[in-house]
Amino acid sequence: MTRVRRGYTARRRRIKIRLFASTFRGAHSRLTRTTTQQKMRALVSSHRDRGRQKRDFRRLWITRINAVTRDNGVFHSYSKFIHNLYKRQLLLNRKILAQIAIENKNCLYMISNKISQIKEII
């Protein structure tokens, strides 16, 4: 069997890993073994946090909507506000509601007043 000289292939693989880990600090960007370990760890963290990011943003939107609805006084809680939105078939998602709550509170107050007026009629 002939001998395989792996110089170019191995170097190219290490350079690719080094470029990925170039922003890491200390030995994590210089030593081959630690860079490969850190690359694996970084990829695992990014995969995990993509799922976590969705949960965190949903929690943030709910907190913002809840703060404004409690300020308003029409609905005493977020859950009642969302329940009445669904009952009236006003399908606004939480992201849009949170954006309205921050940028234009009066618009959210108008929505909540409209829901409460419909409730009184029924």
From Swiss-Prot:
| Claim: Nucleotide-binding is one of the keywords in the record | no
Under InterPro entries, the record lists: Ribosomal_bL20 (IPR005813), RIBOSOMAL_L20_CS (IPR049946), Ribosomal_protein_bL20_C (IPR035566)
Matches recorded under SUPFAM superfamilies: Ribosomal protein L20
Instruction: Report the gene name.
Output: rpl20
Organism of origin:
Dioscorea elephantipes
Q: Where in the cell is it found?
A: Plastid, Chloroplast
* One CC-aspect GO term: chloroplast
Family affiliation: Belongs to the bacterial ribosomal protein bL20 family.
Record key words, sorted: Chloroplast, Plastid, Ribonucleoprotein, Ribosomal protein, RNA-binding, rRNA-binding
Tell me one GO molecular function of this protein.
structural constituent of ribosome
Name of the protein this chain belongs to: Large ribosomal subunit protein bL20c
Q: What is the lineage of its organism?
A: Eukaryota, Viridiplantae, Streptophyta, Embryophyta, Tracheophyta
Q: What does this protein do?
A: Binds directly to 23S ribosomal RNA and is necessary for the in vitro assembly process of the 50S ribosomal subunit. It is not involved in the protein synthesizing functions of that subunit.
Signal sequence span is none
Q: Which GO terms describe its biological process?
A: ribosomal large subunit assembly; translation
